[in-house]
Amino acid sequence: MDNKIFITLGSQKFQFNRLLKAVDELCEKGTINAEDVFAQIGYSDYLPKNFSYKKFLDRDEFSNEMEKANIVITHGGTGAIIGAVKKGKKVIAVPRRAKYGEHVDDHQLQLIKQFDDLNLICSCQDTGKLDVALKTVQLTKYNSYESNTVNIINSIENYIKQIKV
């Protein structure tokens, strides 16, 4: 696979070892070229054996890694997903799960489902199927992100006009 992959796990104080281990296994099998992977692993205590990583990145480092990548594998955080989609990246989102100590609840399941339903990302609920998600993301044409800011401003302007009458 000759795709540059950036893995970003956010900065919340939860580990996401399960995802890092899955990527490590795919590198070991040769499914992913380890040289093409870089991860920002946050508070995870699993240290990848087969690909480069750093616990945290400053803003410039993060932007640089995002720019180099054409595939972003991320947790189900809204900011991480929207940031990658806005930059035109193919996104695989894997939800953090409470039962694995990755978050306090399972809200990321619903967030990822919404983005997937809008055809903005590839949802990967099971890290054991990450190889399938990587194939899917390469073959799928995703919708581009469109900001709703203009609609919100127009709605506010219309509301203001109505209350002035």
PLM features: residue spans?
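Nucleotide-activated sugar donor-binding and catalytic core shared by glycosyltransferases
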Residues: 1-165
